[in-house]
Amino acid sequence: MSSNTHHWIARRGTALQGSLAIPGDKSVSHRAVMFAALADGVSQIDGFLEGEDTRSTAAIFAKLGVRIETPSASQRIVHGVGVDGLQPPTGALDCGNAGTGMRLLAGLLAAQRFDSVLVGDESLSKRPMRRVTGPLAQMGARIDTQDDGTPPLRVHGGQALHGIDFVSPVASAQVKSAVLLAGLYAQGETSVTEPHPTRDYSERMLSAFGVDIDFSPGSARLRGGQRLRATDIAVPADFSSAAFFIVAASIVPDSEVVLRAVGLNPRRTGLLAALRLMGADISEENHAEHGGEPVADLRVRYAPLRGAQIPEALVPDMIDEFPALFVAATAASGQTVVTGAAELRVKESDRLAAMATGLRTLGVQVDETPDGATIHGGSIGSGVIESHGDHRIAMAFAIAGQLSSGSVRVNDVANVATSFPGFDTLAQGAGFGLEAAESG
């Protein structure tokens, strides 16, 4: 069955085996469509993630006057309109659940000659946006939010933007990317300096599209007025999606899987460092580069894990992988301590609270703190888990079920389709004990 169902029943399956093709990277897919739309000429995108979030972004650019063809589910052909070619939309632009889409579009639309409104689903409508609208306002943009800084975003066009040297108070690739996109339209130079280095997808891809951009870990700089050249992009497999199979193969005895052509952006792979610190057996094979992004096959074998103190320096490089890491920690001997991860409280759900509560429901001892948790390794029992509509929480507890003494029911799993359509089918084929069902 597809992931667009209401609940899963997860229980022990078999050892995980096989060579698995993980869907395309969500962050790269968003940016590939955006930058191809702004380019001069026609770009072909292969490996595009056919998820709800990325479809929302593609649909928005169609409303902005960009012709996008879909020869197959994982392919898009984008007829770029150039940096000045976007057209005024009719009605609001619906980002769905995509925080990446909304924040990057805020930077792009702030520089257009027309007004626009960005809306999202119930989850996205609760997420903080002032971290983006603040620096854009410093550049001369006018964007209104709700009183509490949440969407919808009302973007007033026709503003003359000027470059700024922005020192970001938060380590956020989305904030950085929004400012850089606005900087393409701004007079002068725009730079972003971060408290910790974040993922550099935008910088790498802008360079692939011909933009002269200087970047290094923690900083980026470009000048306004540049044009983008159409180019073909091969989207790597999504590391955050691969993370669930990396953890599952690491904790289910006798497992060995190969995950093909996974994106290994150095600002994305903190989970690999954390798991290796815990004793995981993960090797990289067949290194290559796709669209400026490093990729490799990952071979993961079962290995007994031990608890560890997760270095805070790794946190920005694994912020989306913590739900999976928490499950790995339950299978480890001893305690695993996470600190410096308060950002998890403002994701699609409060992921610290959701994981701590869910694991306690299954009999695991978890001591929650404002910016992290201590997870005590031990056995996983049975229980009913509320995913709070968060795709990563749902998939994390599907893994937990593979070590359950009984079964784990995971409610509200439809949002898995935002990032990993077909997760349950791929998991079942690899050996997961996982049933998908409609809730009564």
Curated annotation (Swiss-Prot):
Keywords: Amino-acid biosynthesis, Aromatic amino acid biosynthesis, Cytoplasm, Transferase
Gene Ontology BP terms: amino acid biosynthetic process; aromatic amino acid family biosynthetic process; chorismate biosynthetic process
Positions of the catalytic residues: D320 (proton acceptor)
Reactions catalysed: 3-phosphoshikimate + phosphoenolpyruvate = 5-O-(1-carboxyvinyl)-3-phosphoshikimate + phosphate
Keyword Glycosyltransferase set for record: no
Binding of 3-phosphoshikimate, residues: K26, S27, R31, S172, Q174, D320, K347
Record's protein name: 3-phosphoshikimate 1-carboxyvinyltransferase
Top-level taxon of the source organism: Bacteria
One Gene Ontology cellular component annotation held by this UniProt entry: cytoplasm
NCBIfam families: aroA (TIGR01356)
Quaternary context: Monomer.
Protein residues bound to phosphoenolpyruvate: K26, G99, R127, Q174, R351, R392
Top class in the EC scheme: transferase
Pathway: Metabolic intermediate biosynthesis; chorismate biosynthesis; chorismate from D-erythrose 4-phosphate and phosphoenolpyruvate: step 6/7
Family affiliation: Belongs to the EPSP synthase family.
GO molecular function: 3-phosphoshikimate 1-carboxyvinyltransferase activity
Keyword flag Translocase: no
Species per Swiss-Prot/TrEMBL record: Xanthomonas oryzae pv. oryzae (strain KACC10331 / KXO85)
EC id: 2.5.1.19
GN (gene name): aroA
Stated role: Catalyzes the transfer of the enolpyruvyl moiety of phosphoenolpyruvate (PEP) to the 5-hydroxyl of shikimate-3-phosphate (S3P) to produce enolpyruvyl shikimate-3-phosphate and inorganic phosphate.
PROSITE patterns: EPSP_SYNTHASE_1 (PS00104), EPSP_SYNTHASE_2 (PS00885)
Compartments, record wording: Cytoplasm
Alphabetical list of InterPro entries matching this protein: Enolpyruvate_Tfrase_dom, Enolpyruvate_Tfrase_sf, EPSP_synthase, EPSP_synthase_CS, RNA3'P_cycl/enolpyr_Trfase_a/b
